[in-house]
Design a protein with these regions (language model features):
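Alpha/beta-hydrolase active-site loop
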Residues: 1-18
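Alpha/beta-hydrolase fold nucleophile elbow
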Residues: 19-31
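Hydrolase active-site cap/lid region
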Residues: 38-83, 140, 148-151
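Short beta-strand/loop motif that positions the catalytic acidic residue
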Residues: 103-104, 109-112
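C-terminal catalytic histidine-bearing segment of alpha/beta-hydrolase fold enzymes
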Residues: 125-168
Length: 168
């Protein structure tokens, strides 16, 4: 809860600054920061673009459907059922897909590595597929594990250049 409140306060602070143009508000992060970027964009409609590299905290309910959840894998299964049903119910509200489903207007770039075993691609896709914004793109990197990958930077730089070009 505190993490999400801090996101909102940080965005409120940025929007209160006299040097903010009143139009452009981009959130960007990787892994847990990617989860925070999706949450920030979902919680604040003033966000104009979101970049999430291998976002964490996606698809917490995956084990209930026999899939692997993304980090941190809150739901433990026991005998085909959640070991703690209260945890299974609660984490749905802290799932990046829950926040992603609220991103209506922001331009979105999501990146995933196909050999990432921390934030598995299926969990990233669960969040990406929840985004209703018409301007969304996912880029797959078949060779990428979790963490920094040089091509992430190239794709991100191109996306940002398109967002920040004069006249946009």
């Amino acid at each position: 809860n505190g993490m999400y409140r801090r996101l909102i306060r940080a965005l409120d602070y940025l929007k209160s600054r006299p040097d903010w143009d009143g139009r452009t508000l981009i959130v960007y992060g990787g892994s847990q920061g990617g989860a925070q970027a999706l949450a920030a964009a979902g919680l604040d409609p003033a966000v104009t673009a979101v970049i999430a590299h291998e976002p964490a905290m996606c698809d917490h309910g995956a084990p209930l459907a026999g899939r692997t959840a993304g980090w941190p894998r809150f739901i433990r299964m026991k005998g085909g059922k959640p070991a703690d049903p209260a945890v299974a119910r609660a984490v749905a509200y802290y799932d990046s897909a829950f926040f992603a489903a609220r991103i209506r207007r922001a331009e979105c770039l999501v990146l995933t590595g196909f050999i990432d075993t921390t934030c598995v691609p299926s969990s990233v896709y669960a969040a990406f597929n929840s985004i209703p914004s018409a301007s969304k793109r996912i880029v797959n990197f078949p060779q990428a594990i979790h963490g920094s990958y040089p091509e992430f930077d190239r794709v991100t730089d191109e996306f940002l250049a398109g967002l920040l070009r004069p006249g946009k």
